[in-house]
């Protein structure tokens, strides 16, 4: 991390004293630049192309050095459109990697890959900046304790608990509640853990990024009246950006998250939507740089690039970065190298189900498809593990019986199976929960349910103590006491 002094009147552009080169070739977003002998820039140095296009408009394009070609030539990838550039234009070597603003000044704001604000809310305090390229924390700095990251969301905490400093894959199509779940997690980490969140929009639709920003303002995750009280920083490199920007925007978001972890010593939630687009952008850049493609046309450095990003997402003795990554699976092929490489890094998967969303059960997390490496007796304890397994067995049996019930009717199944079905339906409804960020839409106050309360609630349903209560009493409530109170009001 570097502290940049504030600009003064006497300050002449420091870039004038840097190495100067000239563009010799432009192929889309890739530039070849020649520098004077002995003045070659380092790999990952930021270069700036300044000049005017054919109509006299000012050009300011930032590039990143990717290859040293020999004969004093380098190859760089542009972070913005190269329209208007021409051979012979002057290129300035900044002498350092891309650096972005970090700290409290980033909260409530939207940035591009270069750390420039793009929300029309004025400049950002850039006195504290940090380079986007840095090493993963050393082994000695890592926190080796396996601890649960409590989210306050019943279905997640019980069946697919998140690891503090872990990586979670979020699978879900359009309209099943991915955005609302993301916003609730951002809200809960701020309230329960005193933490902040960073959202990295990598290669997704600009409209979705805009919708997320508007919904965050509406649900007060971003506080318009006092921007410093916001709980999230947003970094966007959407699908209309050049591949260089989409490849690096994840690192920009991660750099902002690392400052909150290492300097502010906070728990941070890092969202990456979509991790597949990070790989896709790397594949495009690799082809443009002339590398031989690997399996299915991906870059030969796929595993290294993914590891460089993922290994920086971890818990240290200062704080933690817990990452939730939306994963697009091309053609639903889980063996595709991009998702397969991602899975190797994940600690848990949260799968959203369209069937549950159609039933009105939100969050629509599929209890049988969602998994976690943390769900082991030695980590979560025997009580939690046993309760989770019994819940899964009940739901699995209900799933097996559904076809039979649809054909023959509920009267044709055994008494024991009827009891299983009744309890499974109560469990399914009890997984639903009113969210804080959805209060403005539903009118129901949000509920944060602690892990102990969650376990107690499901144990009571499984024990049969609540068999007499109607199943609608369990729908959209917080803890089990609210369900029993609701049942009293229903009768």
From Swiss-Prot:
ATP binds at residues 172-179. Its EC number is 7.1.2.2. Keywords: ATP synthesis, ATP-binding, CF(1), Chloroplast, Hydrogen ion transport, Ion transport, Membrane, Nucleotide-binding, Plastid, Thylakoid, Translocase, Transport. Signal peptide: none annotated. The keyword DNA damage does not apply. One of its GO terms (molecular function) is proton-transporting ATP synthase activity, rotational mechanism. SMART domains: AAA (SM00382). Its main location: plastid. It catalyses: ATP + H2O + 4 H(+)(in) = ADP + phosphate + 5 H(+)(out). It is found in: Plastid, Chloroplast thylakoid membrane. F-type ATPases have 2 components, CF(1) - the catalytic core - and CF(0) - the membrane proton channel. CF(1) has five subunits: alpha(3), beta(3), gamma(1), delta(1), epsilon(1). CF(0) has four main subunits: a(1), b(1), b'(1) and c(9-12). Belongs to the ATPase alpha/beta chains family. This is ATP synthase subunit beta, chloroplastic.
């Amino acid at each position: 991390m570097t502290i940049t002094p504030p600009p003064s009147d006497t300050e002449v552009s420091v870039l004038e004293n840097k190495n100067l080169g000239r563009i010799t070739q432009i192929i889309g977003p890739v530039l070849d630049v020649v520098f004077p002998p002995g003045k070659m820039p380092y790999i990952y140095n930021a270069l700036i192309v300044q000049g005017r296009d054919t109509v006299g408009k000012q050009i300011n394009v930032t590039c990143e050095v990717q290859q040293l070609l020999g004969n004093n030539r380098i190859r760089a990838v542009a972070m913005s459109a190269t329209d208007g550039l021409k051979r012979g234009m002057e290129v300035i070597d900044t002498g350092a990697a891309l650096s972005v603003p970090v700290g409290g000044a980033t909260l409530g704001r939207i940035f591009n890959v270069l750390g420039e604000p793009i929300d029309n809310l004025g400049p950002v305090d850039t006195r504290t900046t940090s380079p986007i390229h840095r090493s993963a924390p050393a082994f000695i700095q890592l926190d080796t304790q396996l601890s649960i990251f409590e989210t306050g969301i019943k279905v997640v905490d019980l069946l697919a608990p998140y690891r503090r400093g872990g990586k979670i894959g979020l699978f879900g199509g359009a309209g099943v509640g991915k955005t609302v779940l993301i916003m609730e997690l951002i809200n809960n980490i701020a309230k329960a853990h005193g933490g902040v969140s960073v959202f990295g929009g990598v290669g997704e639709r600009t409209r979705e990024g805009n919708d997320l920003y508007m919904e965050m303002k509406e649900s007060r995750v971003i506080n318009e009246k006092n921007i410093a009280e916001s709980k999230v920083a947003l970094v966007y490199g959407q699908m209309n950006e050049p591949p260089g920007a989409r490849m690096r925007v994840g690192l920009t978001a991660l750099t902002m998250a690392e400052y909150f972890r290492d300097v502010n010593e906070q728990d941070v939630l890092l969202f990456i939507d979509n991790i597949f687009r990070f790989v896709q952008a790397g594949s495009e850049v690799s082809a443009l740089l002339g590398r031989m493609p690997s399996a299915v046309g991906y870059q030969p450095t796929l595993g290294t690039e993914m590891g460089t990003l993922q290994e920086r997402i971890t818990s240290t003795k200062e704080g933690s970065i817990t990452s939730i990554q939306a994963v697009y699976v091309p053609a639903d092929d889980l063996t595709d190298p991009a998702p397969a490489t991602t899975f190797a890094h994940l600690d848990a998967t949260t799968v959203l189900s369209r069937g549950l969303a159609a039933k009105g059960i939100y969050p629509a997390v599929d209890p049988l498809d969602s998994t976690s490496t943390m769900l082991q007796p030695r980590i979560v304890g025997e009580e939690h593990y046993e309760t989770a397994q019994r819940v899964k067995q009940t739901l699995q049996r209900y799933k097996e019986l559904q076809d039979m019930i649809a054909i023959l009717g509920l009267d044709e199944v055994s008494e024991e199976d009827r009891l299983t079905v009744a309890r499974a339906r109560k469990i399914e409804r009890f997984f639903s929960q009113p969210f804080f960020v959805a209060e403005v839409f539903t009118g129901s106050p949000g509920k944060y349910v602690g892990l102990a309360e969650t376990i107690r609630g499901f144990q009571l349903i499984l024990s049969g103590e609540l068999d007499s209560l109607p199943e609608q009493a369990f729908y959209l409530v917080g803890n089990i006491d609210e369900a029993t109170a609701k049942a009293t009001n229903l009768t």
